[in-house]
Amino acid sequence: MSEVSVKAKLAKEAAAEMIMKTTAEKDEALSLIANGLRKELDFLLAENAKDIVNGKENGLTPDIIDRLSLDEKRIRDIADAVELLIDLADPIGDSLETIEKENGLFIEKIRVPLGVVGMIYEARPNVTVDAATLCLKTGNAVVLRGSSSAIHSNKALVSVIYRALEQSALPIHAVQLIEDTSRETAKELFTLNDGLDVLIPRGGKKLIDLVVRESTVPVLETGAGNCHIFIDETAKPQMAEKVVVNAKTQRPSVCNAIESLLIHKAWARQHGKELLDQLENAGVEIRGDELVCELHPSSKQASKEDWETEFLAPVLSVKTVENVQEAVKHIQQYGTNHSEAILTENDKNAVYFQTAVDAAAVYHNASTRFTDGFEFGYGAEIGISTQKLHARGPMGLPALTSTKYIIKGTGQIRE
């Protein structure tokens, strides 16, 4: 049997045990994992350093190196995030609906684990811990398949998790890492219907599209983030500058950073140069339409490809529009249903924008950077879903559950 088949089988066996574990047992394991991450700080940093060296030698871009990198603060933040899960309510067993029939049947709809979650992701070591601990909290087993660029980091993190599980009441095989990062293992996961209950891709558009296109396992899609902000004619200049600069520059390599800026032409003529200067001073390369290049001569001419691109880097495409309707039309054509925002003092335009734009999160006068499990109060997230079935937006604990009907009777039969 292949590594994928063997580890999926172990995970499935563990999932059958996990469903019987109590909240206290799961929380104890999470506490052990958090403590283990802090104790093994030097080991984790040393293993991550190997990935960074290899990444630079292999020509990985700075934004990928940033996502790949762990430092003491990031590891402590990851450990803190695990402990936050302990404080969150365990959704397993929650009663969602009850029905009492005239014949005396009592029907209750409750939350149950999904079973075995497959996770395929790119150069983000934090996802290894996020996915593992979210799955453990919700009574699931998980099969992790990261990228070759993060293999040393992922193996180190999972070794810490294993040691914690050995000390806990949870089955050690509930977390599995596929160490073979070849394309063949990914393709095997795509068709492992008897081993996985769901497959979650987390990464760039190419990875997500590949999984959605080729997987026969049900996919919980986490979409790419070609996010926009539209500055309407009545937007306050200071607020617009603050929000746009934050949404683009705070962390350009994440999926809720903006990639395109749409500006009402009247606002652009009056305030556009100052905003574009601020962005340029913050290290952002501007690729704009004709009016943008006229207002800000150091900008590059934008192409159709720029409107379509999730840069994940300090690059921003900027387009001027006549009105909110044109802004919405542009987003409908190029957006990825992730996070979109309007900055305006016109409530009618805000309502129109938030109603017409089809996205998981639509903001009025706020940065798109808030689309995040922690910011929404869910704790850590397994990803941000841009699809409409099962879950949409930041996916916290409830997104990793399914439902079951529990029916109690006293001998009723159907006539």
From Swiss-Prot:
Q: What top-tier enzyme class does this entry carry?
A: oxidoreductase
Please name the InterPro entries in this protein's record: Ald_DH/histidinol_DH (IPR016161), Ald_DH_C (IPR016163), Ald_DH_N (IPR016162), Aldehyde_DH_dom (IPR015590), G-glutamylP_reductase_CS (IPR020593), Glu-5-SA_DH (IPR012134), GPR_dom (IPR000965)
PROSITE patterns for this protein:
PROA
Its transmembrane ranges are none
What is catalyzed by this enzyme? L-glutamate 5-semialdehyde + phosphate + NADP(+) = L-glutamyl 5-phosphate + NADPH + H(+)
Q: Name one GO molecular function term.
A: NADP binding
What is any one GO biological process for this UniProt entry?
L-proline biosynthetic process
Give the EC number. 1.2.1.41
Keywords noted in UniProt: Amino-acid biosynthesis, Cytoplasm, NADP, Oxidoreductase, Proline biosynthesis
Q: What is its main location?
A: cytoplasm
Its pathway is: Amino-acid biosynthesis; L-proline biosynthesis; L-glutamate 5-semialdehyde from L-glutamate: step 2/2
Q: Which GO terms describe its cellular component?
A: cytoplasm
Location comes to: Cytoplasm
Q: Which SUPFAM superfamilies match?
A: ALDH-like
| Entries under NCBIfam families matching the protein | PRK00197.1, proA
Q: What does this protein do?
A: Catalyzes the NADPH-dependent reduction of L-glutamate 5-phosphate into L-glutamate 5-semialdehyde and phosphate. The product spontaneously undergoes cyclization to form 1-pyrroline-5-carboxylate.
Q: Which family does the entry's similarity section mention?
A: Belongs to the gamma-glutamyl phosphate reductase family.
Q: Per its UniProt record, what HAMAP family does this chain match? A: ProA
Annotated protein name in UniProt: Gamma-glutamyl phosphate reductase
Which species expresses this protein natively?
Answer: Bacillus subtilis (strain 168)
